[in-house]
């Protein structure tokens, strides 16, 4: 289905520079778009691609359109039509969602014959329950929820209206998932937190005893508009709930330990690990494979770059990095050798300073 720029602006705002009746039926990158497609410029370093693109129209910020100059709407090469908006990237995302919705017919409400639903569960008539879904006693499935094949919903758990669980996602007992959640395949919500009490006597080979499992009797509370990536795990709390606040976006294969609280609008990239009882503020960004120790607090607007390790609280907004960027292997070996000898070098410097001070050559 193609829409005119005028129709897009009526839905999403912005201003048209060019032909308001130009029709676009999809989106594509600047260097691949054709005359019936809409492209976008989110980074001014790609401005040269705007000049050569074959796109029918381009989403662009006002300052970037100005950079194109007076010829932007009069040249024979490149686009002549623009939707001018302060945030082309977000505009692109909304248009993309619209095109997907238009191209994807809604699934008919109902329960697949192979699904297993406890009589004590409550499932809205507008819900879509796929093959081999299991819903235990006391669970509540609200309006418009879609549970794909093999989804498991534990006893007493609530799934908020309009949520979508992809195949093989699981949410254990006693959890609350807010409206419009998106939970991707293989994600697990509410598994036991990693809680074990040491009960050992003696040392070395004479040591006896074991680890005693601590029952995890809390749950998981997830706010509205949260997205959880494939194979991500969110552990239930030991006593109080683990909490994921509204509009948090979590990538694939992320581990969130028990009793964590993740603040609203925070994003967490793939393979990050967050140990138990850690609080992350609002609007934070956690890079891929970052590791955050337990019982620490990150303030609002904290950014942790990829592969960084956080071992203490960071209350102040800012960008924090501890990862070592990749370098040539030989250079790395030289640096590693220097690091191993830092203590010896420090002692030599102290000795030299002391000798110079004794000779009156410098202040120690």
Curated annotation (Swiss-Prot):
Entry keyword Repeat: yes
Residues annotated as the enzyme's active site: 258
Pathway(s) served: Bacterial outer membrane biogenesis; LPS lipid A biosynthesis
Gene3D superfamilies listed in its UniProt record: 1.20.5.170, Hexapeptide repeat proteins (2.160.10.10), MurE/MurF, N-terminal domain (3.40.1390.10)
GO biological process terms held by the UniProt record: lipid A biosynthetic process
One annotated Gene Ontology cellular component of this protein: membrane
Catalytic activity: a UDP-3-O-[(3R)-3-hydroxyacyl]-alpha-D-glucosamine + a (3R)-hydroxyacyl-[ACP] = a UDP-2-N,3-O-bis[(3R)-3-hydroxyacyl]-alpha-D-glucosamine + holo-[ACP] + H(+)
PANTHER family: UDP-3-O-ACYLGLUCOSAMINE N-ACYLTRANSFERASE (PTHR43378), UDP-3-O-ACYLGLUCOSAMINE N-ACYLTRANSFERASE 1, MITOCHONDRIAL-RELATED (PTHR43378:SF2)
UniProt-listed NCBIfam families: lipid_A_lpxD (TIGR01853), PRK00892.1 (NF002060)
Subunit-structure text: Homotrimer.
Family: Belongs to the transferase hexapeptide repeat family. LpxD subfamily.
The protein's name: UDP-3-O-acylglucosamine N-acyltransferase
Protein species of origin: Burkholderia cenocepacia (strain HI2424)
């Amino acid at each position: 289905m193609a829409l005119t720029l005028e129709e897009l602006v009526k839905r999403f705002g912005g201003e048209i520079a060019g032909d308001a009746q130009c029709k676009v039926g999809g989106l594509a990158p600047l260097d691949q778009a054709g005359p019936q497609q809409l492209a976008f410029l989110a980074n001014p370093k790609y401005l040269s691609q705007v000049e050569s693109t074959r796109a029918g129209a381009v989403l662009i910020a006002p300052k970037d359109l100005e950079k194109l100059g007076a010829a932007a709407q009069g040249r024979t090469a490149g686009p002549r039509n623009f939707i001018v908006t302060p945030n082309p990237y977000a505009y692109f995302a909304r248009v993309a969602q619209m095109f997907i919705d238009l191209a994807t017919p809604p699934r008919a409400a109902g329960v697949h014959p192979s699904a297993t639903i406890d009589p004590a569960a409550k499932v809205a008539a507008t819900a879509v329950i796929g093959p081999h879904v299991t819903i235990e006693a006391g669970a509540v499935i609200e309006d418009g929820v879609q549970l794909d094949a093999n989804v498991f919903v534990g006893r007493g758990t609530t799934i908020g209206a309009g949520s979508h669980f992809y195949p093989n996602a699981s949410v254990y007992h006693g959890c609350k998932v807010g409206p419009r959640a998106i939970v991707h395949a293989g994600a697990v919500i509410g598994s036991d937190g990693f809680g074990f009490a040491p009960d050992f006597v003696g040392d070395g080979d004479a040591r006896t005893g074991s680890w005693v499992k601590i029952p995890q009797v809390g749950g998981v509370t997830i706010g509205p508009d949260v997205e959880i990536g494939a194979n991500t795990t969110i552990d239930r709390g030991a006593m109080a709930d683990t909490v994921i606040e509204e509009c948090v976006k979590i990538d694939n294969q992320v581990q969130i330990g028990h009793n964590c609280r993740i603040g609203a609008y925070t994003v967490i990239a793939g393979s990050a690990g967050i140990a138990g009882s850690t609080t992350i503020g609002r609007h934070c960004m956690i890079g891929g494979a970052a590791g955050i120790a337990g019982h620490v607090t990150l303030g609002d607007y904290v950014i942790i770059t990829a592969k960084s390790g956080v071992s203490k609280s960071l209350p102040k907004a800012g960008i924090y990095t501890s990862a070592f960027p990749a370098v040539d292997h030989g250079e790395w070996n030289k640096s590693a050798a220097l690091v191993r000898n830092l203590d010896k070098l420090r002692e030599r410097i102290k000795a030299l300073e002391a000798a110079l001070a004794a000779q009156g050559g410098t202040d120690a």
